[in-house]
Amino acid sequence: MSDLFNYEHVPHPYRDGYSVLPRLRKIPREEIFRYEPSHFQRCLTEKKLARESQIFEVEQRLNDNLREAVRVFLLQEYPIPLNPAASLGEVVEQMQEDVVIHALEGEDDWMAYGHVCLPSSWRPEEKIGQHLRSLHTPIPGINLNNSSQLVETMVHHGPFERFIWSVVFDDRLNFHPDIPKTPFDVNKPTVYVKVERQVTVGFPEQFGGLFLLSESLLNEDEIDRPALANSIRKMNDAELEYKGLIDCAAELVNWLECT
């Protein structure tokens, strides 16, 4: 079993009482990265495959100081040695995490860079340049009236961690929207919980923040079935639609509770 959730005080993605909106936790700098050798290799393999078939690197108004600060930070702080590389993208290709950089200028904020090979149902080329408010608009129940304040907190404080989860029926980490998803089949159920660990790191002197996105799968033996069923049962229709479970929630809950 992955040790992803074995750290003290780490919230379990669906056991701690929320269904859609994730909780933020401030973490010490030594917990920014988590390295598991077998999972690391799987991520690198799937990232390489994704780069052959989809747009993964995007950029808009990324200033050179912020780019260089992030590149140096990754080379110096990553838990295993990375080969020095002149470009930020070449550094990220050696990591299990995907990377997004958000920039802040006065009251204006925007996604300035993305190197995202394993997205969760979104296209980097459609999100580049957008405000934080626009990036998260589809999430039901989220209040982004003070989105610029949230970006400022990310840039000047932290690092912060949160987990986002979804139920999937494919044994893969890449859920780019161009790849068809397998629907739930009650006669041949194969169920996973995909967990995205998001960590933010601020670069106040360069007016930006770094998002580290790391994908993991919990298999059927690792899923807490009663807790997952309870979380799904609590969702309203908007939340079920957002999670992609609107058409199978009842059957899925029944399967979780009866097997």
Roles of regions detected by a PLM:
Residues M1-T259:
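Extended, well-ordered protein cores
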